[in-house]
Regions:
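Beta-sandwich strand segments
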Residues: 67-72, 190-198, 301-306
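Substrate-binding/catalytic cleft of secreted carbohydrate-active enzymes
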Residues: 357-358, 366-584
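Accessory carbohydrate-binding/adhesion or oligomerization-edge regions at the termini
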Residues: 1-101, 181-183, 254, 531, ...
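Intrinsic-disorder/low-complexity, polar/charged segments enriched in Ser/Thr/Lys/Arg/Asp/Glu/Gln
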Residues: 53, 119-125, 134-136, 164, ...
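Surface beta-strand/loop "capping" patches
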Residues: 214-242
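Active-site-adjacent substrate/metal-binding segments within catalytic domains
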Residues: 91-127, 133-139, 143-150, 156-159, ...
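Extended acidic/polar, glycine-enriched regions
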Residues: 171-177, 239-316
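Accessory beta-strand-rich segments of carbohydrate-active enzymes
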Residues: 2-21, 40, 44-45, 59-63, ...
Length: 585
């Protein structure tokens, strides 16, 4: 008997995830060490013999109203279109592009959403040859929510558009052709946490990956690169699934073995300690990376190999100065959205690499991932090219302030605590092994501070990397690990840089402008005095210009090529306020 496609998860505040695998680091396994070593970490998902990228043609059906969604998938199977995944509804003709800045796309009354919101159904068939293996499916990005079905059986649910969602499909599959379906609601309760200044889009906008593995496999890995007395040490904590076997870990530089460790009878978890190493540190100026090769051999005979980059860097705040590798640093950054005029959210790896290359060419050394975690490949590129990253959780509730005049409606409400922490935890667990991560950010313009305090306390139990959140500056707490402001006047920045004239609290921690020099029109023409002040005092950490590029929807035909808010018949919009980038779309 088929499970009904019509679940209530998207509108059930108590459910923000269901049957998800625990959050874990991003990696791509191979069956041999040689294949793993020869792979490119950025493109490995497309070349692995243990991972099938399910991106490409999917069957799709769009419903303007959820009430029109049938319960049975077979009832619509013959009436479905073919769409390319990754993509969004707004760039494939199902809905018009829609831009709004700090408001919700509907009248806000959290956690309620419009009951009869649009919904899309995606279907993909694939073949399974070996049912003795375990199989997991991973969605790197789905906006706004997803209910997953496999062979007409309900599997689980996820929200948090820019967070990775992974499910175990093993018990749902059979030999031969299998079918997965994704019911993608336009809005969910979690939409209240995604009120970012951008075009609002929907759909499966990042890659979908199917992994096959034995019982003894790598489920997660955590890299610890501790620093003391001028030396770096390396240790690993591995999660290994069921079964038992041998684990070998090798650190290499350009193919040369630097160190190796082995555990013979590992089961469940394994800890490997390499001790002190002679290694070169990673920084934006010298992004030195090593290869970490993990080889697993199960007692049942299965083999698996993973190769991931590792960088050694040490971050520390002493007083009000931010140090990296024992040197004060300046973050000369930009805010970066996933934005493409043709593909919208669905950026290709080439799009990401182009953006990273451009930032480096213009002497930018930092990116704030405004306002959500990027595709993990973007972080691999930042590791490789050398960019400091402020990795930001997929949290913004700006509309609570602008429309409801209750800025703390979510952040002060303990009922939302689990929703907040889920998004922060999933970002942290996926991205914590990247040397480019220079700060964690708890989100943007979501007021503060009760739920942010909880997230901060939980993060500090797990990491020594500093934690950022701008809005706490307007509370009695004042700051977490750095003082962060957006768009302050020159005179205030100058007083902080000079070490006198500002209130004493401005000097208690490193001072960072998470947004400044709003690049609309001539808005970025006042960079020089800001940058001069960044170099006036060691307490000045720097800042990130708002923002990297204009947002627009491109049309090859028609009277104009680029359109903005209000150009698509929408009543509620924010016009061309999205043309605020350093570069054209």
């Amino acid at each position: 008997m088929s499970d009904s496609l019509r679940t209530t998860n998207y509108n059930d505040f108590s459910v923000y995830k269901d049957n998800l695998l625990p959050p874990a680091a991003y990696f791509v396994p191979f069956s041999t060490a040689q294949d793993a070593l020869e792979s490119d970490p950025v493109t490995a998902r497309y070349s692995s013999d243990r991972v099938t990228c399910l991106s490409g043609d999917w069957r799709f059906r769009y419903y303007a109203k959820e009430s029109n969604l049938p319960a049975d998938l077979d009832a619509i199977a013959a009436e479905m279109d073919t769409v390319s995944v990754p993509s969004t509804w707004q760039h494939t003709g199902y809905e018009e592009p829609y831009y709004v800045n700090a408001r919700y796309p509907f009248a806000p009354k959290p956690p309620q959403i419009p009951a009869d919101c649009p919904v899309g159904v995606y279907v993909k068939k694939f073949e399974i040859e070996n049912t003795a293996l375990h199989h997991t499916i991973t969605f790197l990005g789905v906006a706004g929510s997803l209910d997953l079905f496999c062979n007409d059986r309900y599997v689980g649910y996820s929200e948090g558009s820019h967070n990775t969602a992974a499910f175990d499909l093993t018990s749902y599959l059979h030999a031969g052709v299998n079918r997965v379906a994704v019911v993608n609601h336009k809005w969910c309760n979690g939409t209240y946490m995604e009120c970012q200044d951008m075009f609002r889009e929907n759909g499966i906008f990042r890659d979908v990956l199917l992994r096959s593995h034995g019982a003894f496999c790598l489920e997660d890995y955590v890299v610890h690169t501790d620093y003391a007395d001028g030396k770096y040490t390396l240790s690993l904590d591995l999660s290994l699934g069921s079964g038992s076997g041998q684990v070998k870990a090798t650190l290499l530089q350009e193919g040369r073995e630097v160190a190796a460790q082995r555990v013979e009878n590992a089961a469940g978890t394994a800890h490997l300690n390499f001790g002190a190493l002679e290694v070169e540190p990673w920084s934006a100026e010298t992004p030195v990376l090593y290869d970490l090769l993990l080889e697993l051999t199960g007692t049942e005979g299965t083999r698996e190999a993973v190769c991931r980059p590792v960088g050694f860097r040490h971050i520390e705040i002493r007083g009000n100065v931010f140090y990296l590798n024992d040197q004060p640093i300046k973050l000369l950054g930009v805010n970066h959205h996933d934005s493409h005029p043709v593909r919208g959210y669905a950026m290709t790896l080439w799009d990401m690499e182009r953006d990273v290359q451009v930032t480096k060419q213009f002497n930018v050394n930092c990116v704030r991932t405004s306002h959500y975690p990027p595709d993990p490949a973007f972080l691999d590129l930042c590791d490789r090219y050398g960019l400091y990253v402020v990795d930001e959780a997929d949290i913004e509730t700006h509309g609570c302030q602008v429309e409801m005049h209750r800025p703390g409606a979510l952040s002060h409400n303990p009922k939302w605590r689990g929703h907040f922490w889920d998004r922060v935890e999933r970002m942290f667990c996926r991205d914590r092994n990247h040397p480019c991560i220079t700060m964690w950010s708890l989100g943007n313009e979501s007021h503060g501070y009760k739920n942010q305090d909880y997230c901060y306390q939980e993060l500090k139990k797990r990491t020594t990397v500093p934690v950022h959140y701008e809005a706490v500056v307007r509370t009695r707490r004042w700051c977490y690990d750095v003082i962060s402001e957006m768009y302050p006047w020159h005179n205030r920045v100058h007083m902080v840089a000079e070490g006198k004239g500002a209130l004493p609290k401005y000097y208690k921690a490193p001072y960072f402008l998470c947004e400044y020099a709003h690049a609309m029109g001539m808005g970025a023409g006042d960079l020089e005095p800001y940058v001069q002040d960044f170099y006036r005092g060691d307490n000045m950490l720097g800042g990130c210009i708002w923002e990297f590029c204009d947002h627009a929807a491109y049309h090859a035909d028609g009277p104009v090529h680029y359109t903005y808010g209000g150009d698509h018949g929408e009543n509620k919009h924010d016009s061309n306020f999205c043309t605020d980038g350093l570069f054209f779309p």
